[in-house]
């Protein structure tokens, strides 16, 4: 092999290495969910939240976001965003989600009872954020969780005292 061929081979290899490094990587935004954020509290005790959900399509992602909002209010409390949202969860019993697993499986089923306690009243045009990965999409939406009504329902069903 002569010097010209070696130089051409080296240049082609270098170009291939440099160009492969220019490929944009896959977005990881859809793989991470942002914490549920408090946007405000209404006079009736309901909480306006900014929440993310992930699903196979837009409808699944939005339904999952609603479930995440109710689940956060029930079991974790709202710790991010503006002041005013109740940091204390509705269900304070340790391992209540596991203890009442059958109840909450039915409650959080697709199209389930949880939908009675979530409102899209505070959703504004163009207030949704979208991230997409190869297999799923992630949407961040604004919802209102009817905390007082939710608490009353759990009392009536003897989940909380």
Question: Where are the predicted features?
Answer:
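Bacterial N-terminal signal peptides that target proteins for export
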Residues: 1-10
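Hydrophobic helical h-region of N-terminal Sec-dependent signal peptides
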Residues: 11-15
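Domain-level marker for long, solvent-exposed, non-transmembrane regions
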Residues: 22-161
């Amino acid at each position: 092999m002569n010097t010209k061929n070696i130089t051409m081979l080296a240049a082609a290899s270098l170009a291939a290495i440099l160009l492969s490094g220019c490929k944009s990587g896959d977005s990881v935004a859809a793989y991470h969910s942002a914490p549920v954020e408090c946007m405000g509290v209404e006079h009736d005790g309901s909480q306006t939240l900014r929440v993310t959900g992930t699903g196979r399509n837009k409808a699944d992602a939005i339904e999952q976001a609603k479930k995440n909002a109710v689940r956060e209010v029930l079991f974790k409390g709202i710790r991010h965003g503006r002041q005013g949202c109740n940091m204390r969860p509705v269900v304070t019993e340790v391992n209540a989600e596991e203890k009442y697993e059958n109840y909450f499986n039915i409650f959080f089923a697709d199209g389930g009872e949880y939908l009675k306690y979530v409102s899209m009243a505070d959703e504004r045009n163009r207030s949704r954020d979208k991230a997409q990965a190869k297999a799923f999409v992630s949407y961040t939406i604004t919802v209102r969780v009817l905390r007082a009504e939710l608490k009353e329902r759990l009392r009536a069903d003897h989940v909380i005292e």
